[in-house]
Amino acid sequence: MSKHTVLFELGCEELPPKSLKTLRDALQAETVKGLNEAGLNFASVEAYAAPRRLALKIVDVDAAQADTQKRFDGPAVQAAYDAEGKPTKALEGFMRGQGITVEQLSTFQAGKVEKVCYLKDVKGQSLDTLLPQILQTALDNLPIAKRMRSAASRTEFVRPVKWVVLLKDDQVIEATIQDHKAGNVTYGHRFHAPEAVTLAHANDYLAALEKAYVVANFEKRQATIQEQVKKLADEVNATAIVPADLLDEVTSLVEWPVALRATFEERYLAVPQEALITTMQDNQKYFCLINAEGKLQPYFITVSNIESKDPTQIIEGNEKVVRPRLSDAEFFFLQDQKQPLASRKEKLANMVFQAQLGTLWDKSTRIAKLAVALSSITGANPADAEKAALLAKCDLTSELVGEFPELQGIAGTYYARIEGENTEVSEALGEQYLPKFAGDVLPKTKTGTTIALSDRLDTLVGIFGIGQAPTGSKDPFALRRSAIGILRLIIENELDVTIEELVNLALQGYGDIVKDHDKTRADAVAFLEGRYRAKYEDQGVAVDVLQAVQALAPKSPLDFDKRVNAVNHFRTLPEAAALAAANKRVANILAKEATPEGSVVEANLVEDAEKALFAELQAVTPVVEPLLAAKDYTAALSKLAALRAPIDAFFDGVMVMADDAGLKANRLRLLAQLRNLFTAVADVSVLQG
């Protein structure tokens, strides 16, 4: 069968930049799905996207579907013919319905019944016939929240459609898509090459558009932007901040990218750089530049959509536009300094945290008491912890945070520094929100760790205390993410404390506000322990490793983590699979038989294999017990791995369930001793091979 290259392009008014990449990928996926469902084979489907177009290149696609046979089932053979072999009324009705004669009938086996059927030859439909509907269906299925209809069109799309190209090699496929007749005419850059571009062949698409100042390939356009931005940054010994989302958005805004470096007045560098970066990135779509120390430099890079003969005009225009933005940030920053952080508590007293749990000032005072209590665990200075907690939420009332909400905490750090607070206090104000997401950094200061823990615990316990725990997809206070943050803060700072101890400390701050302390405690502890799975699955830890540790229900997150790491290491050992299987066998035996009281009686060991296992247990126990006491579980399991050979020999040569009651009891005690050594770390019997 012959193969073809097909080009499809949908030309539109400017598409939403934040959706362009998603629309391209969805169009590609939906088209691939449609081709597969139609039985049209192809080598690849390449997808392109630029501000005014979505396009696909389908390589080596079949010219038509393969011819097939469709089976139409009739009555059972037994019911199809009478005693003389003539068609019954049932068969005659079937043939009449299909418009066929007896000569065209076939039979097939349906289970134990042989049935009559008609095998109809079905000629495959052509690519030209099938493709327009496949593409239209793909467009209809795109993830578009709000569609619009242009005045002259009966169809809807995310933006008004202006032209459609549908080429099979060098031939136009006759079709109407999105109420536009397909052709071989596309259009170049709106300003550099606004005239029509006629495509002679589907393979000419990318080259023809580049001549018309359009880079249709999204990744190529993006790589060009990255190269240009890096070159401009290198020229001033700086590094560009290039967030992935911003890079995608800028790539979606331009057809012919030209990066330009501009400047702003150095006086604005006195403003918190986070505010300047936020306004330049979010509002202006600029790339900011920093030096080797991470300090913002008085430059920014804009990506223009035109290749100007006088780029200075574009640069000056952008400098003029950004100046008021930076001036606003400077104004807010200076205005805020007129009111000390501590004096803002009155405003916090009028800001509701949660209707039943009080104001933000109520929360601040609870956090302060909790932070003082936690200081003995985190090693923070209690006075620093209390002061930082009372100042922690004050910047929420500031002008700067009002304009840039993402600067909460960060603004507080700047103001605290200006007011002369020590490093522990000032840095804690920004660190209180860390970690913000999975894999985010943790607070560097002990005070920051203390406030971050206190804030999260206060919220979690309070919300559980008023019966508003997360349910299903509803988690308005982001308690699931917060719980993982609590676990990370404990584990990665090596805080030796149980979850219940922390919950109890947080409960003390609520007093009578929380009516049922016992239920709240139980629910909050269970919730936090339930987040272990999400935390460790993000790290790639297998579920059976978690189950092995959870079987022991460790109370301390730090202890839990050490056990997880130990089991994770253990399962990489060559002895692990055999020892896990042996432990499972031991667990099954002990589950069916009550372990007799007392210790193993050495004199009652009669088989060489059981004597050898006992001797190994006696030798390894005094080595392992100090390791367990030191919570060096990895070393403990590594030592226990040496028991594989004597355990295997024991099960090969010893009958545990001996007829002699004394021998049986002694062997059960021996297995219990073995089992207890392993379960002092984890229940390795649940590990899969």
From Swiss-Prot:
SUPFAM superfamilies recorded: HD-domain/PDEase-like (SSF109604)
State the protein's name. Answer: Glycine--tRNA ligase beta subunit
- Superkingdom in the source lineage: Bacteria
GO CC term (a single one): cytosol
Q: Does the keyword Ion transport apply?
A: no
GO terms for molecular function, please? arginine-tRNA ligase activity; ATP binding; glycine-tRNA ligase activity
Organism expressing this protein natively: Acinetobacter baumannii (strain AYE)
Per UniProt, the keywords (alphabetical) are: Aminoacyl-tRNA synthetase, ATP-binding, Cytoplasm, Ligase, Nucleotide-binding, Protein biosynthesis
